[in-house]
Swiss-Prot record:
Protein name: Bis(5'-nucleosyl)-tetraphosphatase, symmetrical
Enzyme class: hydrolase
A GO MF term: bis(5'-nucleosyl)-tetraphosphatase (symmetrical) activity
Catalytic activity, reaction form: P(1),P(4)-bis(5'-adenosyl) tetraphosphate + H2O = 2 ADP + 2 H(+)
CDD domains associated with the record: MPP_ApaH
Family named by the database record: Belongs to the Ap4A hydrolase family.
EC assignment: 3.6.1.41
Record key words, sorted: Hydrolase
Residue ranges that the Swiss-Prot or TrEMBL entry lists as coiled coil: none
Species, as recorded: Thioalkalivibrio sulfidiphilus (strain HL-EbGR7)
Pfam families: Metallophos
Gene: apaH
Keyword Hydrolase: yes
Database matches in SUPFAM superfamilies: Metallo-dependent phosphatases
Keyword Hydrolase: yes
């Protein structure tokens, strides 16, 4: 059995299929981890969603911001944006089944056998793995329950920007959701910044990548994530970023996680 992880699909299924053929992926024996953002901006969002869903237990995907945005559109609590490419999903005869499947995906997955943790964007420095798992569970429980339309409506916004155990209600769930699906930069005191999206080096002096904050409590937890195409392929600080900008005409990256030496492979995207 081999365990592979792949960066953001964002509706780009053809490059994924090329990578899986390259490694001779066998759904009966292997497992594919996806960092989230299965849909949007690319030309094959419906096909990508169906493909990953049909892999069953051979695929583990976490939710990204574009996935949650699609769910919000489906629920009627947010409008389709000009650059969205999700209309084929909204028009599909199996829309309800696909949305129900997507709504039940996790925000975090941890495999103790290989000691890797999968999430879409990042973790605030105040959280260790146990806290991250507990916070993910809080949002997942609501997302899978009767109040999920309200969560999908209330998740939009950048506040609060600082974690506190005393956070409650929708503000708490919004902060958790933002960290798992949108986070890139933090300040030294642990405040999160959702505005700047560029590569490290171009940010304001008080900002640093979430994984570079001194004293980060998740140090020692190996985390594979995506979301950050301007960062690109990055390995260091116990983290692995696999978003290499496929939807922007760059590359899609696949990594084998269960080998002693990390193996990565790429395919061009058009």
């Amino acid at each position: 059995m081999s365990i592979y992880a792949v960066g953001d699909l964002q509706g780009c299924l053809t490059p994924l299929k090329r990578l899986l053929e390259q490694v001779r992926f066998d759904p009966a024996a292997d497992q594919l981890w996806l960092v989230g953002d299965l849909v949007n901006r690319g030309p094959e969002s419906l096909e990508a969603l169906r493909f990953v869903r049909d892999l069953g237990d051979a695929a583990i995907t976490v939710l990204g911001n574009h996935d949650l945005h699609l769910l919000a559109i489906h629920q009627g609590v947010h409008k389709v944006r000009r650059k969205d490419t999700v209309q084929p999903i909204l028009d599909a005869p199996d829309r309800a089944e696909l949305m129900d499947w997507l709504r039940h995906r996790p925000l975090l997955h941890h495999d103790p056998r290989i000691q890797w943790t999968l999430l879409h964007a990042g973790l605030p420095p105040q959280w260790d793995l146990a806290m991250a798992r507990a916070c993910a569970s809080e949002v997942e429980t609501v997302l899978r329950g009767p109040d999920h339309p309200t969560l999908l409506e209330r998740m939009y916004g950048d506040e609060p920007d600082q974690w506190s155990e005393s956070l409650q209600g929708w503000a708490r769930l919004r902060f958790i959701t933002n960290c798992f699906t949108r986070l890139r930069y933090c300040t030294a005191d642990g405040s999160v910044d959702m505005a700047y999206k560029g590569a490290p080096g171009g940010q304001l002096p008080h900002l640093m990548p979430w994984f570079a904050v001194p004293g980060r409590r998740s140090v020692g937890t190996r985390i594979v994530f995506g979301h950050w195409s301007t960062l690109g392929l990055y390995q260091g600080d116990d983290v692995l970023c696999l978003d290499t900008g496929c939807v922007w005409g760059q590359r899609m990256t696949l990594a084998r996680l269960d080998s002693s030496a990390l193996e990565t492979m790429h395919t061009r995207c058009e």
